[in-house]
């Protein structure tokens, strides 16, 4: 009579692993699609966000909007301004203000880099996405330079040409 071999445990999670799928990796909570359309994105940085409890729950519900948001270095601290996080429905009277200014958590060295980059002519700090990483809310902040109208048109032309080329290749493969 043969014995069953031991199961392969290399593909299973360890016993103490968190069961929450949000806590086990990265999950986008909000993406600023207008950022790549309106700006040239140069450098990207990851920053933590100082939030209140109801804000985290609203972000988990998908109520974050980064469309008009920007970053600002004030008194050697980095702030996220105009980021809209909708109110949490199940909260009581002490819900958060949707457009409050939120502190971004980065190292002092990165703050100085961001300050130098944002002080260059035409450069600003734009949040490109908000996401969960190991259960914590993070913001991807990009140093950006504004696009002119003709830059936007050129980008649209390039996207259209690339799409047409991909479609032509796909059609030629089918026949």
Curated annotation (Swiss-Prot):
Q: Does the keyword Ribonucleoprotein apply?
A: no
Q: Which GO terms describe its molecular function?
A: RNA binding
Primary localisation category: cytoplasm
Please give the residue ranges the record annotates as the region Disordered: 1-29, 152-175
Its function, per the record, reads: Required for rescue of stalled ribosomes mediated by trans-translation. Binds to transfer-messenger RNA (tmRNA), required for stable association of tmRNA with ribosomes. tmRNA and SmpB together mimic tRNA shape, replacing the anticodon stem-loop with SmpB. tmRNA is encoded by the ssrA gene; the 2 termini fold to resemble tRNA(Ala) and it encodes a 'tag peptide', a short internal open reading frame. During trans-translation Ala-aminoacylated tmRNA acts like a tRNA, entering the A-site of stalled ribosomes, displacing the stalled mRNA.
Name the HAMAP family for this protein. Answer: SmpB
Q: What is this protein called?
A: SsrA-binding protein
> What is the species listed in this Swiss-Prot or TrEMBL entry?
Koribacter versatilis (strain Ellin345)
